[in-house]
Amino acid sequence: MAVRSPTHPAGPVAEAFAVRVRALESSALSPAATPSYPAARERPEEECGLRTPFQRDRDRIVHSKAFRRLKHKTQVFVAPEGDHYRTRLTHTLEVTQVSRTVARALRLNEDLVEAIGLGHDLGHPPFGHIGEAALDDCLNERFGRRFKHHEHSLRVVERLERDGEGLNLTEPVRDGILGHSGRAPLPRTLEGRIVRLLDRVAYINHDIDDALRAGVLDEADLPREPIAVLGATGAQRIDALVHDVVESSERAGDIVQSAEAGEAMSALRDFMFAHVYLADAARAEHRKIEHVVRALFGHYCEHPDEIPPLVPDADLATRVTDYLAGMTDRFCIRTFEALTLPRAFPSF
């Protein structure tokens, strides 16, 4: 039975909306595009008269608590002092923006790309990839399980949002969220594959920009060969990579990049791991992050009564993981301090 939500009486625009969208997509989109109708949900719902199913998914994601928390989650630098460093939220918006550009050029479904892009990192834990690795280690050592943020992003939209009801997103959006990571199987739609590839394009280039701003890198440090291929500035590199994806994908009938661009991007990624992500200067901060995550994980395993009832029927490992992965950087630090630092006695 379809879920009915309170709506205004349908007027002539609403009554004709789906018909018009189908006609527009039939004439404007590529035959390889994912159509907006029909779009299956786990729990069937009546269609909206003014939004496509993928637009409704986008709106549910944007209005979710997990989406709002992204503004206080690390992209690369933990709690940077400047106002212009990227967060997990700005990264999400940048991935979505460049993904929509590619989708439009290839005549694919922009609404679907937008929903996947906005939702792809909802399950990322605090402190970026270092926090993810620390949580994964804790979970594996204590329970023999693994943590992968793309799988947890799907759990967020399916179970954790709306007090355990989930957002009831369409199947293509859920598939794209799950498949956005290189460690996951390819998404079934071309739109999902766009987000998967453009996520890497965005974060490598934007992380370089932040590292230059922070003084961790100098322009002269960047490797010459990939810079010669892609461009000297961040804007040039993004432009070159986006054009390459569009032209290569149009020829291939799939979402791909040329061998030359792929090799240049991989070289930049290797450079960033060696000189930024895993550099000696960052190791001390990484150890602090690992200490905080381990301390909180151990504490909540021993004191599960302190975990809010996000999903009451979940087992201990899942409850601890859900709670820690949902924390922002600053909430995680405040919680750690409250549990480990002595408090001043009240004066008498």
Give the ranges of each region predicted by the language model.
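Short active-site segment of divalent metal-dependent hydrolases/proteases
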Residues: G119, G123-F127, A202
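Histidine-centered, transition-metal-coordinating active-site segments
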Residues: M1-R88, T92, T96-V102, N109-D111, ...
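Active-site alpha-helix of zinc metalloproteases
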Residues: A115-I116
